[in-house]
């Protein structure tokens, strides 16, 4: 056994028996290789593992060198928002539909993971967004996002009137169904479906993509990731929310603003040595093929 990674966490929320089988196979293989393994508590319960080290996501982040997330992109996003707070590397085995963030093929996962554990991997730092719903005399409500923060109506779809300030300078106003504020990681997710640009992961940029704007002149905007975005709203409005990675929703009350900025920490995402972002675009999203 090498010394690139000593303690490995197994993470995920299995929805299908095949995913649970992958968790069990991974656990037994890592133990046979001599690694210290920490299993997320829910997985250990599902597998009926006895007398094995278990932990929460936070405990895995504190104790392990590498977290292996088994599942789809949703599982990866949910785990990564917590794991990013810690100095831990993260890689994924795809057991979902698209698997844009989960690189390892479940049929060849052990061989690919073996190469990674021997130090043959590519490391990337992916920044997160922090979203705050705030008012002067109220406590802030805060969440984070790997992909995007989305402004949208709370229950029934309707048009929203709002203003956007960038670094406290008025940028534009809009009447639309909402706004997608995306990281480069999220530029191939919801933002892409709304007509936003694809940003390569290394770019220090944030995109603002309108959702069904009531004007022909509204276009996506790309700004520096060091900028702070403030959203202000008309007082005459129905319930609004912001959602983070389509997994966490924060309600917006009357008189409250939304502040969105880059997080102070980042996700350490690793890939197999032969990983290519543009190849992933081609295979996962049907990006155009080579002509010759």
UniProtKB/Swiss-Prot annotation:
EC number(s) stated in the UniProt entry for this protein: 2.7.1.23
Subcellular location: Cytoplasm
Residues annotated as catalytic: 73 (proton acceptor)
Annotated keywords: ATP-binding, Cytoplasm, Kinase, NAD, NADP, Nucleotide-binding, Transferase
Domain of life the protein comes from: Bacteria
Keyword field contains Secreted: no
Class of enzymatic activity (EC top level): transferase
GO process annotations (BP): NAD metabolic process; NADP biosynthetic process
Pfam families attached to this UniProt entry: NAD_kinase, NAD_kinase_C
GO cellular component, one term: cytoplasm
Named cofactor requirement(s): a divalent metal cation
NCBIfam families linked: PRK01231.1 (NF002306), PRK03378.1 (NF002893)
HAMAP family: NAD_kinase (MF_00361)
Protein family (similarity comment): Belongs to the NAD kinase family.
Cited function: Involved in the regulation of the intracellular balance of NAD and NADP, and is a key enzyme in the biosynthesis of NADP. Catalyzes specifically the phosphorylation on 2'-hydroxyl of the adenosine moiety of NAD to yield NADP.
Protein name per UniProt: NAD kinase
Originating species: Salmonella dublin (strain CT_02021853)
Lineage of origin: Bacteria, Pseudomonadati, Pseudomonadota, Gammaproteobacteria, Enterobacterales
Primary gene name: nadK
């Amino acid at each position: 056994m090498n010394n690139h990674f000593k303690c490995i966490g197994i993470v995920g929320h299995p929805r299908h028996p095949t995913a649970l089988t992958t968790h069990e196979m991974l656990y037994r293989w890592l133990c046979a290789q001599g690694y210290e393994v920490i299993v997320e508590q829910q997985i250990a319960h599902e597998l009926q593992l006895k007398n094995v080290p278990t932990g929460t996501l936070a405990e895995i982040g504190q104790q392990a060198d590498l977290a292996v997330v088994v599942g789809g992109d949703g599982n990866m996003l949910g785990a990564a928002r917590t794991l990013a707070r810690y100095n831990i590397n993260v890689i994924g085995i795809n057991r979902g539909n698209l698997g844009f963030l989960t690189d390892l093929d479940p049929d060849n996962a052990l061989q690919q993971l073996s190469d990674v554990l021997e130090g043959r991997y590519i490391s990337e730092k992916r920044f997160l967004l922090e979203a705050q719903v705030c008012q002067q005399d109220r406590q802030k409500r805060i969440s984070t996002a790997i992909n995007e923060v989305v402004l949208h109506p709370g229950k029934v779809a309707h048009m929203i009137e709002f203003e956007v300030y960038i670094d406290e300078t008025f940028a534009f106003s809009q009447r639309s169904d909402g706004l997608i504020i995306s990281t480069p990681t999220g530029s191939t997710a919801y933002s892409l479906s709304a007509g936003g640009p694809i940003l390569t992961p290394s770019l220090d940029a944030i995109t603002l993509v309108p959702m069904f704007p009531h004007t022909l002149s509204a276009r996506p905007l790309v700004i520096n990731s060091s900028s702070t975005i403030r959203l202000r709203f008309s007082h005459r409005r129905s319930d609004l929310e912001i959602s983070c990675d389509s997994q966490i929703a924060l309600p917006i009350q009357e008189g409250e603003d939304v502040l969105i900025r880059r997080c102070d920490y980042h996700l350490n995402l690793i890939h197999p040595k032969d990983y290519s972002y543009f190849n992933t675009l081609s295979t996962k999203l049907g990006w155009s093929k080579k002509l010759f």
